[in-house]
């Protein structure tokens, strides 16, 4: 429809045509230039601070919206309900991995901890694939990107895809019986 390239997950704006975005699971940064007249971008969560507040109100611009061309249709809506904070917006995230051994251990160990911290629950892909938790708990390159104030990883070895989804957390605490686990390379405490 717009006939322009989309630039995803930007973490910095160099100028009106140049943006920085992660690549290779967040292990390198690419500087991308777009000469398209319209820019379509997505922003990586927590990459930018809050805009300064002002006493001035923003201008309101009226636009004419064309009629729906009928190209796509909503076939349903479903809201998930939880007493816990939403994973991508939580200040504290507690994630479990395959090292927990079972879905029962995940629930028994992590749920009381998450309640005490008012934290969201997350998981590694291995824990999701093992059936410990549903797919919407997954943190990582193929899951959700999080950057909380505190990220606690329990029983997570730290595959590069998982690290790409949580390494921007302010403080990372890792608990793993393998002292050589990659999670310790990004952990502040372990």
Where do the protein language model's features map onto the residues?
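N-terminal glycine-rich FAD/FM-binding segment characteristic of electron-transfer flavoproteins
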Residues: 1-190
């Amino acid at each position: 429809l717009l006939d322009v390239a989309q630039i995803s997950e930007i973490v910095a704006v160099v100028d009106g045509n140049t943006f920085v975005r992660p690549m290779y699971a967040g292990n390198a940064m690419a500087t991308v230039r777009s000469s398209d007249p319209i820019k379509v971008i997505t922003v990586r969560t927590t990459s930018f601070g809050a805009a300064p507040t002002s006493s001035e109100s923003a201008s309101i611009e009226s636009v004419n919206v064309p009629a729906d061309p009928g190209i796509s249709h909503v076939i349903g809506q479903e809201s998930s309900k939880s007493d816990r904070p939403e994973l991508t917006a939580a200040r504290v995230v507690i994630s479990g991995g395959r090292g927990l051994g079972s879905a029962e251990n995940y629930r028994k160990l992590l749920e009381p901890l998450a309640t005490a911290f008012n934290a969201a629950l997350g998981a590694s892909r291995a824990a999701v694939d093992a059936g410990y938790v549903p797919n919407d708990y997954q943190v990582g390159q193929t899951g959700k990107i999080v950057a909380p104030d505190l990220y606690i990883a329990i029983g997570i070895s730290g595959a590069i895809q998982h690290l790409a989804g949580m390494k921007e957390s302010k403080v990372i605490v890792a608990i793993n019986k393998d002292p050589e686990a990659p999670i310790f390379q990004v952990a502040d405490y372990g």
